[in-house]
Structures are given as structure tokens and as C-alpha cells.
């Protein structure tokens, strides 16, 4: 009898841990999205308004071009395809928009990525979704493409910051020590 009570108590204690581990991939994606949203928005916001046209070479995207790409071709499109949540109506931005407008649009696009993935489960990752053009792929592949796009453009922005004598957000000293 006593052994049964201990077994029941142990099982009940394990339930929250099991429930939390039911969507490890989707949960990891949400964590990466939060992290990248913070770093990318902070990186763009670090540039003075007069530097939004900066690009190291004529062939590369400017800071404003990166921000517009992430808003218009990146976050709304990719997060919608990855999660199945339709893109919301939003004011279009282009490279002539003010720094404030570009940062606000970027933040809003990441807010959409965050909210659209809130109910995403690992069970949905094998679902077939529209990719680019007529192609289909899995929801998981679209999530990976989205994360890859964030990583690519954060690296680009971090390099632009360093080339302008600034330390990117991910290299900033952490508050409170380590």
C-alpha cells in the first residue's frame, strides 16, 4: 500500500515535466524567435538614423534594406507560411521610411511571428504547407528557413555595427555580471 502511494506521488510529480516536454521543437522555435526578435530589433535600433543607408559595398543590402526585407519578405510571409496564420494587414514600409517607422514595423512583424506561433505544436510540424511559388514543404522546413533568415540577417547587421565601431547586442556585456 505504501509503495503504491509513493508510486502515485512520483507519477503526479512527473506530470508537469512530461507536459512541458510535449513540444520541444516548437518550444525551442519560440525561444529562438524571442531571442532573435530582441537582437535584430535592438541591432537596427542601434544605428543612427543617418546610417540607415549604410552598406559596406554597393552589392550589399543597406541597414534599411535589411529591415524592409525582414518585414516585407521575411517575417510576415515566412511566419505565416510556417504557422498557417494568415498575414495581417499592415502598412507597407520601404527604405525611405524613417528609422522610427522601420523599427516599429520590424517590431510589429516579430510580434506577429510570436503570436502566430503561440499555439504551434510538434504534432503539426510534418504538415504540408505552401512554400515559395507552387512548391510545398513541411511546416518544420518553413520554421528552419525562417530561423535561417533571422540568423543570416542578424549576422549581417552585427557586422555592419562592428564596421561602424559599435558592439552588437549579442556581444554586449550582460547585466548583473556573467
Language-model features: locations:
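Short, contiguous alpha-helical
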Residues: 30-41, 51-91, 130-178
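Acidic/histidine-rich alpha-helical segments that form the ligand environment
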Residues: 40, 95-130, 137-153
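Bacterial N-terminal signal peptides that target proteins for export
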Residues: 1-8
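A short alpha-helix/helix-coil micro-patch that ends at or immediately precedes a cysteine
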Residues: 44-45
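Short, flexible helix-adjacent loops and helix caps
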Residues: 48-52, 82, 118, 122-125
Amino acid at each position: 500500500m505504501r509503495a503504491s502511494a509513493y508510486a502515485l506521488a512520483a507519477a503526479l510529480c512527473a506530470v508537469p515535466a512530461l507536459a512541458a516536454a510535449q513540444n520541444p521543437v516548437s518550444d525551442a522555435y519560440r525561444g529562438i524567435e524571442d531571442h532573435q526578435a530582441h537582437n535584430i530589433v535592438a541591432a537596427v535600433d542601434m544605428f543612427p538614423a543617418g546610417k540607415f543607408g549604410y552598406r559596406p559595398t554597393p552589392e550589399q543590402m543597406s541597414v534599411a534594406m535589411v529591415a524592409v526585407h525582414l518585414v516585407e519578405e521575411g517575417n510576415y510571409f515566412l511566419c505565416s507560411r510556417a504557422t498557417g496564420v494568415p498575414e495581417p494587414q499592415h502598412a507597407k514600409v520601404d527604405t525611405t521610411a524613417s528609422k522610427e517607422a522601420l523599427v516599429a514595423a520590424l517590431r510589429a512583424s516579430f510580434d506577429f511571428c510570436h503570436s502566430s506561433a503561440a499555439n504551434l505544436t510538434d504534432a503539426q510540424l510534418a504538415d504540408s504547407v505552401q512554400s515559395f511559388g507552387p512548391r510545398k514543404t513541411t511546416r518544420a522546413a518553413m520554421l528552419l528557413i525562417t530561423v535561417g533568415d533571422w540568423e543570416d540577417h542578424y549576422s549581417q547587421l552585427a557586422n555592419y555595427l562592428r564596421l561602424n565601431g559599435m558592439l552588437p547586442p549579442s556581444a554586449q556585456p550582460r547585466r548583473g555580471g556573467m
